[in-house]
Swiss-Prot record:
Binding site for Zn(2+): H64, H72, H81, D84
Region (Disordered): 126-147
Bias type Basic and acidic residues, positions: 126-137
Record EC number: 1.15.1.1
GO CC term, one of those recorded: cytoplasm
Protein name: Superoxide dismutase [Cu-Zn]
Family of this protein: Belongs to the Cu-Zn superoxide dismutase family.
Keywords of the record: Antioxidant, Copper, Cytoplasm, Disulfide bond, Metal-binding, Oxidoreductase, Virulence, Zinc
Locations listed in the record: Cytoplasm
Free-text function comment from the UniProt entry: Destroys radicals which are normally produced within the cells and which are toxic to biological systems. Plays an important role in the phase transition, and may be important in vivo, as it would facilitate the intracellular survival of the fungus by providing a non-toxic environment in the macrophage phagolysosomes.
Cofactor binding description: Binds 1 copper ion per subunit.
Lineage, broadest ranks: Eukaryota, Fungi, Dikarya, Ascomycota, Pezizomycotina
Listed CDD domains: Cu-Zn_Superoxide_Dismutase (cd00305)
Length: 154
């Protein structure tokens, strides 16, 4: 079992943790989040980005992690970036607790997300269905108010 965690910080009140667990290279990865301080009653995009670089805030994280050269999509789509995790839903206080299992996110192997950045976006991910070029790259999920580098945990 490999475990990893990212502590979310940024230029906003959004804080939280995102944890990753994978039993072995062929198993799906469970991604869990506990996020506070976001917009109330909203759906917000969450993605793994290419770089573990936050020297210039969350913009330094680069584009979505996309080792197979695909276009942006929903987590359930065959055509998607590895880093495409879709949206999470916040409650009336702007908090979100949840989890998802994903078959493309890996902690083990050549396409590992370790050392990369998880980004929480200010807008809703349109899952690549927005009808424009930006939708096929980012899901039109908007600015990056919080992020954290994914690192090995106990």
């Amino acid at each position: 079992m490999v475990k990893a965690v990212a502590v979310l910080r940024g230029d906003s009140n959004i804080k939280g943790t995102v944890t990753f667990e994978q039993a072995d290279e062929n198993s799906p990865t469970t991604i869990s989040w506990n996020i506070t301080g976001h917009d109330a009653n909203a759906e917000r995009g969450i993605h793994v980005h290419q770089f573990g670089d936050n020297t210039n805030g969350c913009t330094s994280a680069g584009p979505h992690f996309n080792p197979f050269g695909k276009t942006h999509g929903a987590p359930t789509d065959d055509e998607r970036h590895v880093g495409d995790l879709g949206n999470f839903k916040t409650d009336a206080q702007g908090n979100a607790v949840g989890f998802v299992e994903d078959k493309l996110i890996k902690l083990i192997g050549a396409e590992s997300v370790l050392g990369r950045t998880i980004v929480v976006h200010a807008g809703t991910d349109d899952l690549g269905r927005g009808g424009n070029e930006e939708s096929k790259k980012t899901g039109n999920a908007g600015p990056r108010p919080a992020c954290g580098v994914i690192g090995i945990s106990a």
